[in-house]
């Protein structure tokens, strides 16, 4: 048997923490007097880095912008991070773990933080829908594969 078959996959959460938080209401208090029919924009981004052997930090950045016409009602950004021990996987499996599995763990924490910040800004409750990071990761892989195909066709 090869050594690879003897290595079991291991995953452990070491820590989950808020790395950065920002809340701005640039048009307050005037925005409170307007009819509340906002356009809400959600942006997501993930980043990961290796801290030590089998230890990784994953950061999920969630930015929510609510606008009333041309005016920004509020802008909220949360960077929710986690430190994870991950061993026994490599390549695409590791990329999936860092790019989808860990963000799935972090998102509820980021969502709660954003909901709290929006509430403290005295805006109506904001309920962010769950995010399918697995589907986003698959789309990312398909885009990367498409770009690789285009590069080979241009050559």
From Swiss-Prot:
Question: What Pfam families does the database record attribute to this sequence?
Answer: SecB
Query: What GO cellular component term, any one, is given?
Result: cytoplasm
InterPro entries, sorted: SecB (IPR003708), SecB-like_sf (IPR035958)
Superkingdom per UniProt: Bacteria
Q: Where does the UniProt entry say this protein principally localizes?
A: cytoplasm
What processes does the entry annotate via GO biological process terms? protein folding; protein tetramerization; protein transport
Q: Any idea which UniProt keywords this protein has?
A: Chaperone, Cytoplasm, Protein transport, Translocation, Transport
A GO molecular-function term, please?
A: unfolded protein binding
Where would you find this protein in the cell? Cytoplasm
How is this protein organized at the quaternary level? Answer: Homotetramer, a dimer of dimers. One homotetramer interacts with 1 SecA dimer.
PANTHER family on file: PROTEIN-EXPORT PROTEIN SECB, PTHR36918
Query: What is the protein's known function?
Result: One of the proteins required for the normal export of preproteins out of the cell cytoplasm. It is a molecular chaperone that binds to a subset of precursor proteins, maintaining them in a translocation-competent state. It also specifically binds to its receptor SecA.
Family, as annotated? Belongs to the SecB family.
What is the protein's name according to its record?
Protein-export protein SecB
The scientific name of the source species is Salmonella arizonae (strain ATCC BAA-731 / CDC346-86 / RSK2980)
| Gene behind the chain | secB
């Amino acid at each position: 048997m090869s050594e690879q078959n003897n290595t079991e996959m291991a995953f452990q959460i070491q820590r989950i923490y808020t790395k950065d938080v920002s809340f701005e209401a640039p048009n307050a208090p005037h925005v409170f007097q307007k009819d509340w029919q906002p356009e809400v924009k959600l942006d997501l981004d993930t980043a990961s880095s290796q801290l030590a052997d089998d230890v990784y930090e994953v950061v999920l950045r969630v930015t929510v912008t609510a606008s009333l016409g041309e005016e920004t009602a509020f802008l909220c950004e949360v960077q929710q991070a986690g430190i994870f021990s991950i061993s026994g996987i490599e390549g695409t499996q590791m990329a999936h773990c860092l790019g989808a599995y860990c963000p799935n763990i972090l998102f509820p924490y980021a969502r709660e933080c954003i909901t709290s910040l929006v509430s403290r800004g005295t805006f109506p409750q904001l309920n962010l829908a769950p995010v399918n990071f697995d589907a986003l990761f698959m789309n990312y892989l398909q885009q990367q594969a498409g770009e690789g195909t285009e590069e080979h066709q241009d050559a």
